[in-house]
Amino acid sequence: MYYKVAVSGSGKVLNVFSSEELLIGERVWLNWRNGKVKGYVLERSLSHENEATPSERDGKSFLSEGHVEIAKWVSERFFSPLGMVFDLFFPQGIDDYKEEVVVSESPFLDFDRMTLRDFLENFGEKALKEMVKKGLVRVEKNFYVKEPRPRVKKRLFLKKRISEIIREHLTVKQRMVVEYLQFNDGVPLEELLEDLEVSKSVIETLQRKNIVEIVSGDVFPKKRRILRGDFKGNISKENLFFGPTGSGKTEALFELIDVYSRKGTVLFLVPEVSVLTHTLSRLKGAFPDLKIGIYHSYLSRARKNLEWYKAASGKIDVLLGTRSAVFVPVKNLSLLIVDEEHDESFYQHTRPSYDAIVVARKISEVFDVPIILSSATPDLWTYREAKEGRIRTFNFTRRFGSLSVEVVDMRNEEKIGSFAKKTLDRIEETLEEGKRVLIYVRRKGFWGRVQCEVCGYVLKCENCDVSLVYHSDTHSLKCHQCGREYGLVESCPRCGGRLVGRTAGTERVERELKRYFPTRRIARVDREVVDNIMELESYIDKLIRGEIDILVGTRLITKSLSVPEIGLVCIMDVDSLIFNPDYSSSLRTFQLVVQALGRASRGDQGKAIIQTYNPEDTIIRKALEEDVNGFYAEELERRKALGYPPYRHLIQVAVKSKNPEVGKNSLTSLKEFLKGEEVLGPVEHWVFKLRGFYRHHLIVKTEDLERVLPKLEKALRILGIDAIVRVDPPTLEVSD
């Protein structure tokens, strides 16, 4: 029998002959070109050409024909190599957790299955080959997981009230345990250690502090939490949960999980690990009896494979994960949920590129399961389809808290450093009320750029066409694209004029605040001080516990941060977001401002302040009014007139080269090949030089991807151009 097999890590498809019947979606290892490659069985082939020979196979497939259909579709829709797309369905290292078994296919054999090792010891390799050839046995891989043996469970409980624990001096990991137990008091000890990836020594220390206690056995019956039952809607195939922060969207999602987890496995996608950690705690608190798996990039290889296997084998009720979890072949899928579906993190820019939202909707279609997209500021594609009735909309309104927003016109205000005096007054008032303050700054570093005040020259990285950022703690200039650091220079290298800092970054804002409020506890969160999600969680924990009064940060701090103690949110330098040279900058700014303001609406009387030199800008005005519908109507009208998504698709084709003329000429040739299509460019990318390479790109606008993408693929192949292709990226400014 002949089969078409997609080669792992590439776009190559081989025609393969196998004496054994192969399963659709099964992994096979092929002898090809003097080596061995992994492949995925696509379908039976009518061609009798034999390009490679199978040497090994799984013997079973975790992927159904539906998954194969999805892989083909994703490859075509996002111009991603088919073999690379198939690789996304499996975690790295999955083959470290397998054993080969021989399975009987004949009633006359005296065994049902035995390990390959035992079979070879008893019968030998020659017998195995003969029996496989005759169809008497088959060899398959049994993927195993090392799960603990059943035993009496030890459960962990808090012994002290939270008000008492707050006064204790705890490490970051100890605080993580306490916060987890706030939602999940009485959780099995092994489950907590697995979820938080902490050692038993952390628990032992908390025991010595008399904060927790361990009790053996099931000391209370497990049960589902009785939910409010406020959500009465009957969902359709595709649904949008649309409403501001605090409107009850999450509670409604939990009620649906309560229903659909009884029917199968719920796949719950979130944009970031920080959001996942908080959602996991809430889920376990609401459903202590549910088996909840997690899947994200910070898991150890062993843990990730374990979680994947459980989901693929139908051993969990809910799989909670970030972008990559959309490809886990969940067995008996009953419901798809995408929270914060507007977030750009759902798009993978590196090859193979894809949009997890679009993939999730395709999964919903292929496997005929409902999907919920939830957001206060939906993606424009989603919003347009909802308005046109193709997606059912459930509107939610805020049930608690109110928000007072003040716009500070920086043209007319008295300024003290990076702040208006009015802003500093509001910060002081908030602190006097015992509330916390959150300050959003777009850039990290001390100064966003260093510029000559005489000729205007901006210091840039030699490898990248990017302005250097001054960091006061190291007294150095740093490129935040390639990471190269430079020593300080005293004068302008062009004219000898005086160099000055422009556009305050997080370091500068933090230092100013420490000068204005010397007795207050002020911290900074950006990628320079936070390396992983656990560190970010520790800052949030300190904010909740009152160990931080003012938290300064970049976009990190706007990601679903739920802290009722926040009394004021300040947004600095909003203008730099609005005037970013990207077709999506207005929408991205609006979404960020609304999401940031949502952090202040968790409390009883939240306040926010926005510093701007353009107070009449539509984006700011609509965001203040939380007029999502009004802003989206205007944005849709603008994009329709300009031919941008969601009315037309955008295909970005980018190249990089050591010689700038080479890249530009290659894209010029490509444009000629695409004659008849609407093509913008080629032009220099606004980050023209990056890591020593010069970058050019062009944009293709089309309403018909199925027609244009094959044409583009043919052109790139004939011209021999190695390009990065992104279909409908949320932004065009991402570096390669």
From Swiss-Prot:
InterPro entries: DEAD/DEAH_box_helicase_dom, Helicase_ATP-bd, Helicase_C-like, P-loop_NTPase, PriA, PriA_3primeBD, PriA_3primeBD_sf, PriA_C. One of its GO terms (cellular component) is primosome complex. Zn(2+) 2 binds at residues 461, 464, 479, 482. Zn(2+) 1 binds at residues 452, 455, 492, 495. It comes from the Bacteria. GO terms for molecular function: 3'-5' DNA helicase activity; ATP binding; ATP hydrolysis activity; DNA binding; zinc ion binding. ATP binds at residues 243-250. The keyword Transcription does not apply. Pfam families: DEAD, PriA_3primeBD, PriA_C, Zn_ribbon_PriA. SUPFAM superfamilies: P-loop containing nucleoside triphosphate hydrolases (SSF52540). GO terms for biological process: DNA recombination; DNA replication; DNA replication initiation; DNA replication, synthesis of primer; double-strand break repair. PROSITE patterns: HELICASE_ATP_BIND_1 (PS51192), HELICASE_CTER (PS51194). Initiates the restart of stalled replication forks, which reloads the replicative helicase on sites other than the origin of replication. Recognizes and binds to abandoned replication forks and remodels them to uncover a helicase loading site. Promotes assembly of the primosome at these replication forks. Belongs to the helicase family. PriA subfamily. This is Replication restart protein PriA. It comes from Thermotoga maritima (strain ATCC 43589 / DSM 3109 / JCM 10099 / NBRC 100826 / MSB8).
